[in-house]
């Protein structure tokens, strides 16, 4: 015992001295085994503890979460809320822990009066950091911001289906290059000329397929066989009226039949002739029904004002993909959807043209960021294959701000493809959700669940009274559906892919650094005379530049 006591005393006096005696070796081995056992218990324990995250780890984002997504140049940001923005830079910071690149597509939900134009479209326009294509129900955005953009050197184009006498002219044939384009335009027209473009047809598919083949033949004939000045939808309507048969018998022929018979003989490989043969495969009575149906759907082109603005092209959509500052307003009436098919065709051709321009540049990107600000997006009809377009435009420096009143509008417009469109928007703003339980539940689940502590108390009032208090971890939605429904009107939700969601104030347009321009220029009727003067000045400048180039070339020679 005395020896053990002396060894222990010596160990305490010199704890770090190495010793080879039995006692020291035994203690070392025991300590090593104990440490190993503890390590193995921790490593292979079946309990995977996540303190404060047992039922969910959702939390609200703060300044530190949005900071990596901001541009040092505030003018190069895309405003989302009063406190959050997103840099338009195509190359954001990439670290070992995260990649801060996000696509610039934004989807916005907000019922009428929630500030979709005031808090989203307006602030994004006033950045003046992009070229813009805007859907503009009623023309309110044109009146508010048209003169403002002019004052900042923008070339402002207007396709006005409401006040057509004030509209630039748009000829869809000006943007057709080949058979591929004919197929795309025809598909769009047939789809959007229906009473409800989003409805699934229950009729025999031969009707729609027959109309498609006939319209492809007519557009193909006009594009390939007529002179450039005759290539427009007015010529298509002229050909369509030639379908009237010269007799009532089963073997009766129309003037159009004779026209395409000659084309088949002279150009047997003609695209138009082949499509016409496909159409003629329909039985006589079926073909007559197809003729009448297509004629009725295309009747808008018989209206003189529509025929006039579609006869030639002054709008030049290709300029949107240039280095110039350009904005296009597509104004549609809010009392009828009869002319929205033209807007749908224009938007689709815009996407195709801009992608093509980008693809032919060395860096495969447009020289200026281009933003589609699509207010009341469902009102412009349905763009076929939009779910593909929105997933491919990012690399060309093109992006969309899609504005809906509700989630149901998106689901109704694109049915089976709505989720693809939603998932290709890395930013979502909820300005309000109305009272639809389905919408409220969707947004609540998108925010996620957090883990909270609930305090339980109990009190015993017997002869020996006692009071106990305990805490229990529970899961709770970051915001319940009811909390989203009763969210104050000046607050909104922002969700950016891969980042904690934000509960923020909506952007107050009056706080924008460029709002003084709206006070000076906004709210007045768009100044078409001022635009004409500006266009003339630009033309003279371009002529001078051309002359300068020619003179330099002559001097060099």
Cite the ranges covered by each PLM segment.
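Intrinsically disordered, low-complexity regions
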Residues: 27, 57, 62-63, 248-250, ...
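A short glycine-/small-residue-rich loop at the edge of a beta-strand within enzyme catalytic domains
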Residues: 72-76, 341, 377, 434
């Amino acid at each position: 015992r005395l020896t053990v006591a002396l060894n222990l005393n010596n160990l305490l006096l010199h704890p770090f001295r190495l010793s080879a005696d039995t006692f020291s070796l035994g203690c070392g081995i025991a300590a090593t085994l104990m440490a190993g056992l503890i390590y193995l218990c921790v490593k292979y324990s079946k309990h995977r503890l996540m303190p404060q995250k047992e039922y969910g780890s959702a939390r609200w984002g703060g300044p530190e979460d949005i900071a990596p997504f901001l541009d040092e140049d505030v003018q190069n940001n895309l405003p989302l809320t009063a406190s959050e923005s997103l840099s338009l830079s195509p190359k954001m910071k990439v670290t070992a822990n995260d990649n801060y690149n996000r696509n610039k597509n934004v989807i916005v939900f907000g019922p009428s009066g929630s500030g979709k134009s005031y808090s989203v479209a307006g602030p994004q326009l006033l950045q003046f950091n992009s070229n813009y294509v805007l859907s503009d129900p009623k023309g309110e955005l044109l009146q508010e911001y048209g003169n403002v953009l002019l004052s900042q050197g923008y070339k402002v184009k207007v396709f006005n289906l409401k006040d057509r006498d004030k509209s630039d002219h748009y000829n869809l044939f000006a943007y057709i290059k080949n058979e591929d384009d004919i197929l795309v335009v025809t598909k769009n027209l047939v789809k959007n000329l229906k009473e409800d473009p989003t409805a699934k047809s229950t009729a025999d598919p031969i009707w729609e397929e027959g109309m498609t083949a006939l319209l492809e033949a007519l557009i193909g004939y006009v594009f390939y066989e007529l002179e450039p000045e005759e290539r427009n939808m007015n010529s298509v309507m002229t050909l369509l009226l030639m379908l009237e048969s010269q007799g009532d018998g089963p073997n009766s022929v129309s003037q159009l039949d004779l026209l395409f018979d000659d084309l088949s003989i002279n150009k047997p490989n003609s695209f138009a002739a082949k499509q016409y043969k496909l159409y003629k495969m329909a039985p006589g009575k079926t073909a007559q029904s197809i003729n009448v149906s297509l004629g009725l759907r295309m009747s808008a082109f018989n209206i003189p004002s529509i025929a006039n603005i579609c006869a030639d092209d002054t709008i030049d959509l290709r300029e949107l993909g240039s280095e110039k500052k350009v904005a296009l307003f597509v104004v549609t009436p809010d009392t009828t959807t009869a002319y929205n098919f033209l807007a749908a065709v224009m938007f689709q051709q815009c996407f195709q043209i801009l992608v093509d321009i980008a693809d032919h540049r060395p860096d495969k990107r447009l020289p200026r960021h281009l933003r589609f600000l699509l207010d009341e997006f469902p009102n412009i009809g349905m763009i076929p294959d939009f779910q593909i377009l929105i997933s491919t435009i990012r690399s060309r420096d093109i992006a969309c701000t899609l504005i809906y009143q509700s989630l149901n509008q998106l689901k109704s417009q694109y049915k089976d493809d709505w989720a693809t469109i939603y998932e290709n928007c890395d930013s979502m703003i909820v300005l309000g959700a109305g009272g639809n339980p389905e919408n409220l539940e969707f947004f609540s689940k998108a925010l996620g669940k957090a883990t909270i502590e609930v305090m339980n108390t109990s009190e015993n009032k017997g002869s020996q009274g006692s009071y106990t208090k305990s805490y229990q971890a529970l899961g709770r939605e970051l915001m319940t559906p009811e909390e989203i429904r009763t969210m104050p009107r000046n607050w909104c939700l922002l969700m950016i892919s891969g980042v904690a969601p934000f509960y923020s104030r909506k952007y107050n347009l009056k706080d924008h650094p460029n709002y003084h321009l709206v006070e000076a220029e906004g709210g007045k009727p768009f100044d078409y005379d001022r635009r004409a003067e500006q266009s003339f000045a630009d033309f003279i400048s371009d002529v001078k530049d051309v002359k300068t180039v020619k003179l330099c070339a002559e001097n060099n020679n």
